[in-house]
Amino acid sequence: MSEKQVPIIAFNQVDLSFGDTHVLNNVDLEIEAGKFYTLLGPSGSGKSTILKLISGQLTADSGDISFEGQRVNDVPAEKRKVNTVFQNYALFPNMNVFDNVAFGPTLKGMNKTEIKNKVKEMLNLVKLSDFVDREIDELSGGQQQRVAIARALANDPEVLLLDEPLSALDYKLRKSMQYELREIQQRLGITFVFVTHDQEEALAMSDWIFVMNDGVIQQNGSPEDIYDEPINHFVADFIGESNIVDGIMKEDYVVHFVGKDFENVDAGMRPNERVEVVLRPEDLDLTSIENGKLVVTIEDQSFRGDYYEITARDDDGNEWQVQATNSAIIGARVGLTFDPEDIHIMRFNESEDDFDARLESYEDDDEI
């Protein structure tokens, strides 16, 4: 982040407990203006709690929450420049589409012409301009979600918070809404903070992702960085599918696993350090035993539409997931091949700061 740019939202050592349950553990985060952020994690990871702290629905036990450099811990929710879209939409069933979207501008004291123009602008934005007089119970789930977004944006928030807003929609509609939300955010240029447990949603929409588990931000970064360079077992397993096996980092760019040494592109670790090795299923190719870097036995497969999901096992008992364009024969022994850059190495208990510093150090060495 540029030194001159003050984050629109920042958490500094934020801690929160509910009774004996520690919900957030000394969370630090920074959110820049005008980007799409996602808080990603399983149920109970603390992601929705962060959203409620931003909106003012909850108060932290300790630590500072700031908005554009100003501490807001004690600022009430109604005075914060944020609006929230909820999973259940929270629309007013006794009001039609126009009145739902006009609710916020009316409370702000806009005149009738301003309200009409604002509602028209918001409904155009969410592609519901022809639904202005519809009753809420006449709308589909996707249409109700669009109305909820329009209503939240009609208040001109600097930050829009979205708490799992797509989880109740069917798969095709959810995919469509992913693109629409991203388009809306880019058109408006305001900050979106999106909460989800769905890693596909996070990867598809986000500029930046915070991966959470047990009240701790495990890793934050761009979708590409988090997918390609997971920091630990949890992130590697939660973001996409992963094959994870134990290994030993013999020296820079050489790792030992399943009884063999393999070239890779990682460095900056101690000689003979115990590590975990990650290979993504889509990076593995089936080949002949003679050409394979590993030899496995095919145990199972399922057709996934554009690929076969194949389960195999090596002679050491490690299970391997492979995505292949062609089917395999159950019980057959085959080879697996992959490239050095497909191997990702994870250290045990490496902090995110140390992880980033290590990557930067050996990437700089490669450029010399």
Curated annotation (Swiss-Prot):
E.C. numbers: 7.6.2.11
SUPFAM superfamilies linked: MOP-like (SSF50331), P-loop containing nucleoside triphosphate hydrolases (SSF52540)
Any one cellular-component term (Gene Ontology): ATP-binding cassette (ABC) transporter complex
Membrane topology: Peripheral membrane protein
Pfam family, one: TOBE_2
Catalytic activity, reaction form: ATP + H2O + polyamine-[polyamine-binding protein]Side 1 = ADP + phosphate + polyamineSide 2 + [polyamine-binding protein]Side 1
Primary localization: membrane
GO molecular function: ABC-type polyamine transporter activity; ATP binding; ATP hydrolysis activity
Transmembrane segments: none
Family from the record: Belongs to the ABC transporter superfamily. Spermidine/putrescine importer (TC 3.A.1.11.1) family.
Assembly description: The complex is composed of two ATP-binding proteins (PotA), two transmembrane proteins (PotB and PotC) and a solute-binding protein (PotD).
Name of the molecule in the record: Spermidine/putrescine import ATP-binding protein PotA
Native organism: Leuconostoc mesenteroides subsp. mesenteroides (strain ATCC 8293 / DSM 20343 / BCRC 11652 / CCM 1803 / JCM 6124 / NCDO 523 / NBRC 100496 / NCIMB 8023 / NCTC 12954 / NRRL B-1118 / 37Y)
